[in-house]
């Protein structure tokens, strides 16, 4: 039962093969047995079972919706009433929010049962989930490897079937890269599609929440509940609600032959995503996935995203600048860690922040403060914003000749734990294919498409699918067609 997808679990609940309480108990036992993975930072069985009992009551009345009674885990960047909300930081180690984030509230309103809070890189700053104040997360496929970051706890939980689904956030790739590393499906929606209210902020113009699950169809179900306008989020976009499952299982164009359901689909392949730096085993898996798409009727079209290489310096100017502002609120006065011993007020600020923040967070705050300082603002921050607009324009030019863009989610498979901690630049380079999508505000997702070679044979590879603004339903259709023809997303780590 634990290996079933959300769609399959929904059918099991409808057929009364299990109850919501039994499902919750099953996953709670699995979470407890897999503590070594360190995927969860906070679990409260009483709270979980209370929600499950309420869901069973709804189902018994013949009420409830598509998600009622189904379990989910939440990345610990979403504040939750009743559970601690830490953002992976000592600064918030004991913080309990008086309210739920909109994402959490909407999923609970849809009847989902919260299993707990998942581990993450501190304040979502990292690509390996080694920056958490609560310890590194291990990749269920190979426990010597990282699970990706910053949503590494969520990706590990879904991969190890400790939860059938989880929420994540993506600022520069933090849903797509860990989904790739852990062999699960994850989607970053268009910026503004999902409310950021109650999401502890890293970089406000980039942060976006999204679902992680076994399949594209599961992600579509979750996105139905998560998305929508929220007046409490000034960046939330007011659009008509839509059903993200509406194209699943349908041909790309009416009248397509059953054997070629994607005939007419044009897949753009950026030259810049297949150059130097792409590992051979990742390239082989991506090439095989693209051949599968051709077999389904799609056409491959070369495109260019010439500013791809600039996405890293642009991101690491803009994101730290916004982080330095957002994290200024954590001063030991209003909430968060406060130093036990200090002199005057200024000394209390300094010591509280020095003790509460980890090394990577401090590094990015310093970088952000520097690029915003007098004499450097124009040279760095404003220049980065100008290039950001050009990056978005490059995508729009590419979409004139294709419907979706594809390539690797990461240039390599997951690396060994501890292997890149001393070289942050190498860690930053791992996000080369995801950063530009975030800078442009476009939707993107990762779907499992293979494994690495030889020594990396247990480490998954993810195919990134990028859509135009608000084109998530079509993007999910394209991913779903691939998953109907392959079984990469159904494979599980040994022992699971």
Swiss-Prot record:
GO terms for biological process: translation. It catalyses: L-glutamyl-tRNA(Gln) + L-glutamine + ATP + H2O = L-glutaminyl-tRNA(Gln) + L-glutamate + ADP + phosphate + H(+). Keywords: ATP-binding, Ligase, Nucleotide-binding, Protein biosynthesis. Pfam families: Amidase. It comes from the Bacteria. It is an enzyme of class 6 (ligase). Its EC number is 6.3.5.7. The keyword Ligase applies. One of its GO terms (cellular component) is glutamyl-tRNA(Gln) amidotransferase complex. InterPro entries: Amidase, Amidase_CS, Amidase_dom, AS_sf, GatA. The keyword Iron-sulfur does not apply. The active site is at 75 (charge relay system), 150 (charge relay system), 174 (acyl-ester intermediate). Allows the formation of correctly charged Gln-tRNA(Gln) through the transamidation of misacylated Glu-tRNA(Gln) in organisms which lack glutaminyl-tRNA synthetase. The reaction takes place in the presence of glutamine and ATP through an activated gamma-phospho-Glu-tRNA(Gln). Heterotrimer of A, B and C subunits. NCBIfam families: gatA (TIGR00132). Belongs to the amidase family. GatA subfamily. This is Glutamyl-tRNA(Gln) amidotransferase subunit A. The lineage of its organism: Bacteria, Pseudomonadati, Pseudomonadota, Betaproteobacteria, Burkholderiales.
